[in-house]
């Protein structure tokens, strides 16, 4: 498979970014057919991926630890446009000796919000990376903003390859959630169209293949982060059971991701007796800070 290599200056150092494309099967059997015939099929699509290797990388010897770093709604991966997706969020990771990988998504615009095809495509990119480079087959997973959807869905879909996850101001609920009388807006609630582009709600209807413009719980099963691997306990509280340790960084002044929703997700994981950490940052909005980047490295260092 052809690769494109580009060099960018990051933190006053030249870094090489390796772009490549992977094919994935985007078919989902949602027809409901009861005919006694093969209904599954291969519906091939292609997505672009980008990999950044640290200076310490070697083609033989010890494997380099791989991190999957998933971009948010404002990011994408595209060599032609010099877009590096979630790799751009975490320069301190490759400075610390980690390799970092992201994909565009199941559609060229990248705004696929953790839908099944996005997760399957990310796995294909992971397989390509560990096959062609001397990288670990157990991964650390990171996501920012809408990349929180992708992160949670990836670790739940492929738990056997994940060591731990970290997320910056993650979007965690597709549909709205009420916490102690406070309504936490879901991505489904975002109906505003900008510059002629589809709204977030429109994107969900498209990429999750809803049969109409009404919310369709069935089409989101397994890929709605707050509801995956979860149940309601006797007190009426949701209990979420993630497959690996998680740490989240969230600003108290974030108006894009509701801090109340993030706290509720953390509490729901703790109700399950699972390990999760939260660093709530006073006065910080929807942005990445040096504290987040420094602590992400420290968090991931615990698992290698």
Language model regions located:
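N-terminal cap/lid segment of alpha/beta-hydrolase-fold proteins
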Residues: 2-61
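Short substrate-entry loop that stabilizes the transition state in hydrolases
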Residues: 59-64, 72-112
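Alpha/beta-hydrolase active-site loop
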Residues: 113-133
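Alpha/beta-hydrolase fold nucleophile elbow
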Residues: 133-145
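Hydrolase active-site cap/lid region
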Residues: 153-215
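Short beta-strand/loop motif that positions the catalytic acidic residue
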Residues: 242, 248-250, 254
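Conserved alpha/beta-hydrolase "acid-adjacent" motif
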Residues: 255-261
């Amino acid at each position: 498979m052809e690769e494109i290599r580009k060099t960018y200056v990051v933190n006053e150092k030249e870094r090489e970014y390796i772009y490549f494309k992977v094919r994935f099967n985007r078919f989902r059997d949602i027809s409901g057919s009861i005919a006694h015939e093969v209904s599954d099929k291969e519906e091939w699509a292609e997505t672009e991926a980008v990999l950044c290797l640290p200076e310490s990388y070697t083609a033989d010897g010890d494997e380099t630890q791989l991190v999957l770093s998933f971009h948010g709604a404002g990011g994408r991966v595209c060599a032609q446009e010099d877009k590096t997706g979630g790799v751009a969020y975490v320069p301190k990771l490759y400075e610390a000796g980690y390799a970092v990988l992201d994909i565009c998504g199941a559609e060229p615009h990248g705004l696929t919000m953790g839908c099944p095809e996005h997760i399957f495509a990310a796995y294909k990119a992971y397989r390509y990376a560990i096959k062609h480079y001397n990288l670990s087959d157990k991964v650390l997973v990171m996501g920012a903003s809408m990349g929180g959807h992708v992160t949670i869905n990836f670790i739940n879909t492929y738990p056997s390859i994940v060591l731990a996850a970290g997320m910056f101001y993650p979007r965690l609920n597709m549909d709205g959630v009420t916490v102690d009388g406070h309504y936490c807006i879901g991505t489904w609630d975002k109906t505003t169209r900008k510059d002629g582009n589809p709204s977030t709600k429109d994107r969900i209807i498209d990429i999750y293949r809803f049969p109409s413009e009404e919310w369709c719980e069935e089409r989101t099963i397994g890929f709605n982060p707050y509801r995956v691997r979860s149940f309601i306990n006797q007190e009426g509280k949701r209990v979420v059971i993630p497959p690996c340790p998680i740490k989240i960084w969230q600003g108290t002044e974030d108006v894009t991701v509701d801090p109340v929703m993030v706290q509720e997700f953390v509490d729901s994981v703790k109700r399950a007796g699972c390990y999760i950490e939260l660093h709530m940052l006073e006065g910080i909005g929807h942005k990445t800070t040096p504290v987040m980047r420094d602590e992400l490295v420290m968090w991931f260092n615990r698992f290698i």
